[in-house]
Regions:
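N-terminal signal peptide c-region/cleavage motif recognized by signal peptidases
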Residues: 47-49
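Residue-level detector of the transmembrane beta-barrel scaffold of outer-membrane proteins
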Residues: 83, 87-89, 127-135, 177-181, ...
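Outer-membrane beta-barrel architecture
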Residues: 114-121, 165-167, 225-229, 270-276, ...
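Short glycine/proline- and aromatic-enriched beta-strand/turn motifs that initiate or cap beta-hairpins
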Residues: 53-150
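Outer membrane beta-barrel transmembrane domains
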Residues: 253-356
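Outer-membrane beta-barrel strand-turn architecture
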Residues: 121-126, 170-178, 232-236, 279-284, ...
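Outer-membrane pore/translocation modules
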Residues: 60-68, 122-268, 298-300, 304-310
Length: 356
């Protein structure tokens, strides 16, 4: 048992609490491993005269209790909701994000892949047309913390998700369409951690397993978005401007315990600008155009930095193949590469797009 000194805040547990309260809560801490950072620093607080008289089980219980007090699964839910927002785009894409991290925190990486299929009902583009979009998405978040010589914790989150959304493509003019959309989705979230070093293996692993690390759950998401699609020809370029404001709610449905149960909300604004310049060339017998890509995403809400960043830009280039003469349902296919950059993140991605 923890003695009276600890209860008064002068023993090991008091040292833990003091250090927990002094950790800077900046956006540059990766939110998904921040609790591990806190727990690791908390153990440093245990290196006090009270350590000699404390039992290992008591230390594990103390770390677990304080991690439970500071662990906020809402951040995990908010991070998942933010990743769901990435799937709003109709493009097949693979992106790699590398958020910045603080000293001692290994720079995390977020890998996102999505495969959407969109079905538009009706051929009259001058009239409102309903559409359905199904998306299969996969994400991994890898991170870690090197908090002492010979000590390391590596964490990996893996999520699989499926969403189905429906909406209307409502023409407002020759160039502008309005896109209201509602959606629902299901996802699985799984975490696995690797511990290296005696402190990590003997104290932090039993203290944090099933709470901060090494647990899985499922979640349902509900979302709505209002978007626009503006297209016209300017100075020999076909210009497309797509924008949307979206809001997603995510809720765990079979959390292993009450401490990792979450309900989170996330809002985002996405802007995507594409310029298409026809060329005299052909690829595989299809007219070829050069495409310029520019985009911006901003995440809003109290947990907007759950992924370690709340905004980023995209810039890239690609090619567009006009396949309309083949009689397919598709009008064009697009392939490109993009750079991702922002105040707290950088990365890159690949795009395979299509236009119906």
């Amino acid at each position: 048992m923890i003695g009276p000194a600890a209860q008064r805040g002068t023993g090991p547990r008091g040292g833990i609490r003091t250090l927990l309260q002094s950790v800077p809560k900046t956006r540059r801490y990766n939110s998904l491993i921040r609790e591990a950072v806190l727990a690791a620093i908390a153990f440093i607080g245990l290196c006090s005269p009270g350590l000699a008289s404390a039992q290992s089980d008591d230390l594990i219980d103390a770390i677990r209790e304080l991690a439970r007090e500071n662990f906020d699964p809402v951040k995990i839910g908010a991070g998942y909701a933010a990743m769901v927002d990435f799937a709003v785009s109709p493009d097949i894409s693979s992106a790699n994000f590398y958020p910045d991290a603080s000293d001692g925190v290994v720079d995390p990486s977020l890998k996102h892949f999505q495969f959407p299929l969109r079905f538009v009902f009706g051929d009259d583009e001058s009239a409102p047309r309903p559409f359905l979009q199904a998306v299969v998405a996969h994400q991994t978040v890898e991170s870690g913390f090197d908090y002492a010589p010979g000590e390391f914790i590596a964490s990996e989150w893996e999520t699989w998700g499926f969403s189905l959304s429906g909406g209307y493509d409502v023409p407002l003019s020759e160039h502008l369409s309005f896109l209201p959309v509602l959606g629902v989705g299901y996802g699985s979230l799984d975490n696995r951690a690797r511990y290296s070093g005696p402190i990590s293996e003997q104290l932090l692993q039993p203290a944090l397993a099933g709470l901060v690390f090494d647990w899985d759950t499922s979640a349902v998401t509900y979302g709505a978005s209002l978007g626009f699609d503006y297209r016209r020809t300017l100075a020999g370029f076909d210009v497309e401007v797509l924008g949307s404001v979206s809001h997603h709610y995510v809720e765990s449905i079979d959390a292993p315990n009450e401490f990792v149960d979450f309900r989170s909300r996330m809002s985002a604004f996405d802007l995507d600008v594409r310029t298409i310049h026809p060329t005299p060339w052909k690829m595989f017998g299809n007219p070829l155009s050069i495409v310029g890509l520019f985009g911006n995403t901003r995440i809003f809400g109290p947990e907007r930095d759950a992924l370690g960043f709340d905004s980023f830009f995209e810039a890239g280039a690609g090619v567009d193949l006009d396949v309309s003469a083949r009689g397919w349902k598709l009008k064009s296919l697009r392939f490109g590469v993009k750079a991702i950059f922002g105040p707290d993140v950088d990365g890159w991605g690949l795009i395979i797009g299509y236009r119906l």
